[in-house]
Amino acid sequence: MSIQRESIIGSRRWSNMIWCAILVTAGSGFWFNGMQSELALQGAIMCFYGSVAVTLSVYLFLTIWWDVGGGYNEYDTENKSITIWRRGFGNKTIFLKYTRDQMQALKVVVKDGLNPKREIYLCTTTGAQIPLTAVGEPMPLAELEQKATQLAQWLNLSLVGMRA
């Protein structure tokens, strides 16, 4: 089989849905309590915080609804190309297609610490670095290494490592 398709999970995750529910519940509570408050300044501040929380929950709901960041990577060895398709905000799509001549290497970035980062990038001849892994929980190092070497062999590219 010469075509390999890999699904990428976008913003349609349980953690985002839980945060959206928490924000809309807490924001509505703040807003209603602010409206019922007998102290004008305290009520106005609570209404403001409630409005901000509800606005953020609407933004998060739309991000989940449109599944921003979701899509697929398609690796084709027969045509020697890679296709990257993602959903963007406002239901816009991002479609990138690179031939073997435009690909330079695969880059692995590993950053430990408070905000760990473990990602695989496609480096192009123009200098662009396109992420191939999904955003979210960083994958284990063994899985990242296996996936990167498999992709490098599949696409016949060199593998460049970087530890930050």
UniProtKB/Swiss-Prot annotation:
It comes from the Eukaryota. Coiled coil: none annotated. The keyword Glycoprotein does not apply. It is found in: Plastid, Chloroplast thylakoid membrane. The keyword Electron transport does not apply. Seems to be required for the assembly of the photosystem I complex. GO terms for biological process: photosynthesis. Signal peptide: none annotated. It holds the Pfam family Ycf4. The chain crosses the membrane at residues 14-34, 45-65. Belongs to the Ycf4 family. InterPro entries: PSI_Ycf4_assembly. It is a multi-pass membrane protein. GO terms for cellular component: chloroplast thylakoid membrane; photosystem I. This is Photosystem I assembly protein Ycf4. Keywords: Chloroplast, Membrane, Photosynthesis, Plastid, Thylakoid, Transmembrane, Transmembrane helix. The lineage of its organism: Eukaryota, Rhodophyta, Bangiophyceae, Cyanidiales, Cyanidiaceae.
